[in-house]
Amino acid sequence: MATFLGNPVTFTGSQLQVGEIAHDFSLITPALEKKSLADFAGKKKVLSIIPSIDTGICSMQTRHFNKTLSDLEDTVVLTVSVDLPFAQGKWCAAEGLDNAIMLSDYYDHSFGKAYGLLINEWHLLARAVLVLDADNKITYVEYLDNINSEPNYDAAIEAVKVLG
């Protein structure tokens, strides 16, 4: 059972599994542009899903994946939260991560519902990492039972590297 701040939580929707094709989405960037999965066609994708960029672990996760994977060819890190796009942009500017791709699900939580990550009790996204190949097939997933803990960075990074 997943917990957030030590309390059990429930989710809307079903979590995706390895072998499935990732659902398309429409999310908002800090520049208020809509982005979908199709905008990253032909690239390997790391979906780094966090509750809020304004927390220590979420900031650490976002920095780690962006700094570690930014040099890999044909690979993008997509950080998804329900933070307002303005907050995401402000965080990136403060951290000097100008090339980080931040996507907000604040508007209708459609991403959280489709991916089974919307926490019913808080209307935040659960912490998760999904790796997609260039055809959007899910090759790695980590759903954290303790949403207040860090993901297994090494396993996710290795999952990207084995895609070539």
Swiss-Prot record:
Keywords: Antioxidant, Disulfide bond, Oxidoreductase, Peroxidase, Redox-active center. It is an enzyme of class 1 (oxidoreductase). Residues 16-162 form the Thioredoxin domain. The active site is at C58 (cysteine sulfenic acid (-soh) intermediate). It holds the Pfam family Redoxin. InterPro entries: Redoxin, Thioredoxin-like_sf, Thioredoxin_domain, TPX, Tpx_CS, Tpx_Peroxidase_subfamily. Disulfide bonds join C58-C92. The keyword Disulfide bond applies. Its EC number is 1.11.1.24. It catalyses: a hydroperoxide + [thioredoxin]-dithiol = an alcohol + [thioredoxin]-disulfide + H2O. Thiol-specific peroxidase that catalyzes the reduction of hydrogen peroxide and organic hydroperoxides to water and alcohols, respectively. Plays a role in cell protection against oxidative stress by detoxifying peroxides. The active site is a conserved redox-active cysteine residue, the peroxidatic cysteine (C(P)), which makes the nucleophilic attack on the peroxide substrate. The peroxide oxidizes the C(P)-SH to cysteine sulfenic acid (C(P)-SOH), which then reacts with another cysteine residue, the resolving cysteine (C(R)), to form a disulfide bridge. The disulfide is subsequently reduced by an appropriate electron donor to complete the catalytic cycle. In this atypical 2-Cys peroxiredoxin, C(R) is present in the same subunit to form an intramolecular disulfide. Belongs to the peroxiredoxin family. Tpx subfamily. This is Thiol peroxidase. The lineage of its organism: Bacteria, Bacillati, Bacillota, Bacilli, Lactobacillales. The gene is tpx.
